[in-house]
Amino acid sequence: SIHKIVRGENFADDPGLFNISGKKFNIPGYKMPKCKNAAGLFSENAMDIIDLFIGSEGILGVITEVEIGLAPKHASISVVKFFDTEIEAIDFTAYLKDSKDVMPDFIEYFNGSGLEMIREKAKKDPQSVSMPKISDNANAALFFDIEIKDNNINAAFNKLLSLNVDWKGSWCAWENIEKERIKNFRHALPETVNEYIAGVKKKHPSIHKLGTDFAVSDEKFGELVEFYDSVLNRSGLKYVSFGHIGDNHLHINFLPSNYDELEKGKEIYKVIAEKVIELNGSVSAEHGIGKLKHRYLEMMYGAEGVREMRRIKSVFDPHFLLNRGNMFPCGEL
């Protein structure tokens, strides 16, 4: 059957019951974490049915057409601030998020080992990076944008200066060509990680990328960062950390040089996932569960939570034909 789903037209009623084209069913009976989350099917009291389909990884139907609304693009200043230590960058993130004046559009983070990888790439192939030199003393960095309101660039700069921090060595851009150079910096690290893994695969063909996608609430982020540092530093494994720190969502990318290190990385991944779940966080804040993270979805929601997702799938796909193996193993309800 074909359903036209328009936001604002179909909500779950008080007991949590949906009725769409004669199909009646209750929303999933589990609570979602209070943080950025893309793990499993969305569920919330009085939810709009469109949110059940968004992020459902294709297990409920085939989306044939999407109509979206776009917010006007605003002028902005791009900033990269470097720090002597990673903890200074993390503390400054909290400071930025609490600011009533600056209110950045986003905040991205890069740890010390990540900056070192970019430095090495810039030395070997300066044109591929196309950005200013990173200070040798920098051990962490934040990248963020702030809006230029009413074309008043001076007012935007004054907001930055009101933060009363040392901006020495920072990068700042408002013209498009310079902002592109800063965007190159943003993408340089994940691209360099991919190049590293590709190089290792030449000797060890079954090596693959291993990275986390975890997130927690504001209140739990400091505890998770301390846990990251403790577990990762003890491991002796090479890794980089970067990502969406404004959402308490960092990607830890392991950089194995052989199969033993890859297996050790997988063990550490599981240990960190258990901690994230203990902190009521998400095992997949952005990329979804797919076919490889079934066990972590069940760890997060429990076996009953996964059964609830299967129940919802059976309403729209009773023979379990769509995207078999996505989110949970194949098989009927």
Predicted features along the sequence, with ranges:
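FAD-binding subdomain of flavoenzyme oxidoreductases
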Residues: 1-98
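Activity-critical C-terminal alpha-helical subdomain
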Residues: 294-333
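Short, highly charged C-terminal tails/helix-capping segments
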Residues: 181, 289-294
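Alpha-helix capping/hinge segments and adjacent helical runs
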Residues: 277-289, 314, 318-322
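Conserved PLP-binding active-site segment of the aspartate aminotransferase-like
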Residues: 253-260, 292, 296-300
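C-terminal substrate-recognition/cap domain of FAD-linked oxidoreductases
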Residues: 54-56, 62-266, 279
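Short, hydrophobic/aliphatic alpha-helical segments
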Residues: 35-53, 232, 266-280
